[in-house]
């Protein structure tokens, strides 16, 4: 492992520690349980799961560092020149499923790939982002989430936030439902057009922004009263989350195809979920407003104060 990979690994381990500590404080009840694991094909990781807390029904913050002799199809399909290269993949990936339907589900991921072949220059890239999936949307929350995303991108150029915001909208789209998974945020992949230090700094900016984006929303919503109606709608909407993750998510597919640890890969799935045949919210209801207003490709900062 070279110095660059060591630096990325040290940052990711620290990021996992910081996020887990902050979420434990916010929950106030449950604590993360760590499961350190090794991958037979090379590498390993630290899976941390929190369940049945005062705030978090289920959450996972996973660090992994895996390596192998060749990239799986999910990673090389759009970069065929990488076929046959050995690889190292490091990342932190997290999903938080709160119990209260008024607190959105959040997802974040930052990762680094390096692919090598004897006699050729290494090929490396960064990826990551964060996105928000509300069940009962609040415009204030969407604006805050996107403002933090914009501010994280700002030192790297005015064009960066719009580019990765739009990519997030496209990436987290449930094609068979023709609807977004949530209200978006940032998504980037194959980032190597800058030099290594700048690219690494951008990944850190995104990783560090997650708590700044999510915790104020949690603090605003976690005491909101709810009943069985809201809970059942949350479970139905979680079904969309499961559909997306198992059918489209590149990280999930990469993990499964590369012989990754199934329990860690599938930690993103909610603990309870429901499907109903052709369930549609009542017109004019708060539930209908989710899809009619919030689950649209929208510039949340257009009308918001700077």
UniProtKB/Swiss-Prot annotation:
Record-annotated site: Important for dimerization: 176
Pfam families: Coprogen_oxidas
Keyword Oxidoreductase: yes
Protein name as catalogued: Oxygen-dependent coproporphyrinogen-III oxidase
EC top class, as a word: oxidoreductase
InterPro entries, sorted: Coprogen_oxidase_aer, Coprogen_oxidase_aer_sf, Coprogen_oxidase_CS
Region described as Important for dimerization: 241-276
Pathway annotation from the record: Porphyrin-containing compound metabolism; protoporphyrin-IX biosynthesis; protoporphyrinogen-IX from coproporphyrinogen-III (O2 route): step 1/1
Positions annotated to bind a divalent metal cation: 97, 107, 146, 176
Catalytic reactions of this protein: coproporphyrinogen III + O2 + 2 H(+) = protoporphyrinogen IX + 2 CO2 + 2 H2O
UniProt-annotated binding residues for substrate: 93, 109-111, 259-261
EC number: 1.3.3.3
Subcellular localization, as worded in the UniProt entry: Cytoplasm
Molecular function as annotated in GO: coproporphyrinogen oxidase activity; metal ion binding; protein homodimerization activity
Function, in words: Involved in the heme biosynthesis. Catalyzes the aerobic oxidative decarboxylation of propionate groups of rings A and B of coproporphyrinogen-III to yield the vinyl groups in protoporphyrinogen-IX.
PROSITE patterns named among the record's database cross-references: COPROGEN_OXIDASE (PS01021)
Name of the gene: hemF
Any GO BP annotation: protoporphyrinogen IX biosynthetic process
Cofactor needs: a divalent metal cation
């Amino acid at each position: 492992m070279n110095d660059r990979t060591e630096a990325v690994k040290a940052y990711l381990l620290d990021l996992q520690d910081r996020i887990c500590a902050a979420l434990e404080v916010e929950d106030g009840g449950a604590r993360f349980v760590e499961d350190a694991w090794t991958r037979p094909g090379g590498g390993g990781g630290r899976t941390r799961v929190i369940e049945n807390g005062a705030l978090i029904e289920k959450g996972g913050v996973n660090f992994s560092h895996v390596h192998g002799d060749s990239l799986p199809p999910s990673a090389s399909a759009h970069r065929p020149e990488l076929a046959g290269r050995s690889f190292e993949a490091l990342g932190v990936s997290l999903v938080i499923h709160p119990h209260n339907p008024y607190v959105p589900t959040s997802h974040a991921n930052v990762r680094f790939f390096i692919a090598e072949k004897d006699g050729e220059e290494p090929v490396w890239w960064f990826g990551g982002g964060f996105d928000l999936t509300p069940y009962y949307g609040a415009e204030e929350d969407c604006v805050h989430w996107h403002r933090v995303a914009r501010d994280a991108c700002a030192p790297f150029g005015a064009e960066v936030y719009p580019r990765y915001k739009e990519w997030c909208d496209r990436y987290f789209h449930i094609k068979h439902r023709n609807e977004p998974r949530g209200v978006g945020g940032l998504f980037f992949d194959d980032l190597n057009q800058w030099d290594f230090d700048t690219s690494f700094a951008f990944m850190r900016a995104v990783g560090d922004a997650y708590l700044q984006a999510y915790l104020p929303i949690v603090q605003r919503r976690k005491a909101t009263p709810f009943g069985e109606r809201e809970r059942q709608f949350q479970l139905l909407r979680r079904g969309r989350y499961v559909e997306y993750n198992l059918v489209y998510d590149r990280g999930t597919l990469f993990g499964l195809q590369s012989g990754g640890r199934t329990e860690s890969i599938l930690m993103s799935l909610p603990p309870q979920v429901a499907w109903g045949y052709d369930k549609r919210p009542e017109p004019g209801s708060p539930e209908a407003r989710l899809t009619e207003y919030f689950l649209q490709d929208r510039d949340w900062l257009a009308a918001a104060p700077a």
